[in-house]
Curated annotation (Swiss-Prot):
Coiled coil: none annotated. The keyword Cell membrane applies. GO terms for cellular component: plasma membrane. Signal peptide: none annotated. To E.coli YfcC and H.influenzae HI_0594. This is Uncharacterized protein YcgA. It is a multi-pass membrane protein.
Amino acid sequence: MSMPAAETQPKKKRMTFKMPDAYVLLFMIAFICAIASYIVPAGEFDRVTKGDVTTAVPGSYHSIEQSPVRLISFFTSLQDGMVGSAPIIFLILFTGGTIAILEKTGAINGLIYNVISKFRTKQLLFICIVGALFSILGTTGIVVNSVIGFIPIGLIVARSLKWDAVAGAAVIYIGCYAGFNSTILSPSPLGLSQSIAELPLFSGIGLRVVIYICFLLSSIIYIYLYTRKLKKSKDASVLGTDWFPAAGMGEAGKEEDQSVPFTVRHKLILAVAGLSLVGFLYGALKLGWSDSQMAATFIFISVLAGLIGGLAANDIAKTFITGCQSLVYGALIVGMARSISVILENGKLLDTVVNALASLLDGFSPIAGAIGMYIASALLHFLISSGSGEAVVFIPILAPLADLMGITRQVAVEAVMLGEGVVNCVNPTSGVLMAVLAASGIPYVKWLRFMVPLALIWFLIGLVFIVIGVMINWGPF
C-alpha cells in the first residue's frame, strides 16, 4: 500500500535588502531635507568676504524666519543643482571624451601592454613598474573605472609568475586605486571638491605628492610580501587551493592574443597629453586657471591626439561624444548631489546643520575635528560610493565647519578625499570593486582577508597626514 506523498510547503521568498541606486539615495536625502525645512529651525551665520573667499563668522549664528521648500521649489532645486554644477559636469564629460580618444588611438593600451610584456618575468620589478604606471593613470583620473578591462592581463601574468588571482588583480587594481585614492590631479573628485571649497584648483600639491608616494610604496611592499608568501607556500593564498576561481582566466595560451604594438605615433600622442597636463598644472598653480581652462585643455588634447593618431574628423567627433556618454552617470550625479545643498540653502538649513555640528564638536581641538571629518567621510562613502557625489554633499557642510573650528579648508577637502579613498577597495557598494572581483572570480569575503590589512595601513597613513596638515596649517586657506 503506497503512502500518500507528503505535501510540500511552498517556499517563501526571502526578502533581501538591495542597496538603492546612488540617484535614488540622493533623491531620498533631498526629499528628507525638503521635509526638514518645515520642522528644523532656520538660521544663518554672518559672513565676510576676503578676496574671492566667503567665510562664516564664528559665534554669529542666529535664527531667522522659516523658509520651507515647497513642492515646486523641490523639483526646481534638482534643475538648479544641475545648472549650478554645469562647469564641473562638462569637465567630467570632456574628461571621458578625451580618454576615449586616447584609447581609440591605441596609445594607452600600447603603453600598458608594452610595460607589462617587458617586466613580466621580473617579479619585484613588475610589481613596482606596473603598480607605479597604473597609480599615475589613477591619480590623474585617466584610468579609474576602466581598470576593470586590464584585470585579465594581471591574471595571465599571475599564472606565469606562479601567483594567485588575488595577486594578479591587486597589481593592476590596487596600483590604480593607490593613485586614485590619494589623487593629485583628478578633475573629480579633487578638482570638484576644491572648486566647492573655493580653493585654487590643485593647490596643496606638494603634500599630496608625498601622500601619494606613501600610498603607492605601502601598496607595492604589501603586494610583494604577499607574492613572496605564495612562493614559499601554496597554503599562503587567501583563495585556498583554487588559485584561479574564474574558469579560463589567466590561461597561458591567451598570452599571444594580448600583443599590442607601441609605436612612435603612440609615444607622440602620450607626450602631447603629458605636456598639455603639465602646462595646465603650471597655469593652475601660477596663473589662476580653473575648470574652464582644464576643459579647454582636454578639448585641445582630444583634437591633437586624434589627428596624430590618424583619426578622421568625424571619427574624432563620434569617439569624443561616445566617451562623454560613458561618464553621463557620474557627471549628472554631481548635479543631483548639488541639489541637496540648494535645498538646504533655500530652506535656510545649511547653517543650522553647520552650527549643530560646531556645537557638537565644541571643545574639540582642530586635530580632533579634522580626524572626525576623516572618519565621517569614510563611513559616508559606504552609502554614497560616488566620490563626486559625496564631495558635493559633504564639502558644503565641512568647508564652513572647518572655518569655525580653525581648520583650513585644504585639510577638510583632504579629509574627504582620504576618507573615501581608504574604503574604496573594501566597499561592497563600489561597482568597480564588484566588477573586478567578478572578472577575477575572487569571492568578496576572501578579498577582504587580503585587502583589510592594507586598507588599515592606508587609514593610518591618511590619519598621520591629516594631523600633519592641521599642524602646518596646510593652505592656502
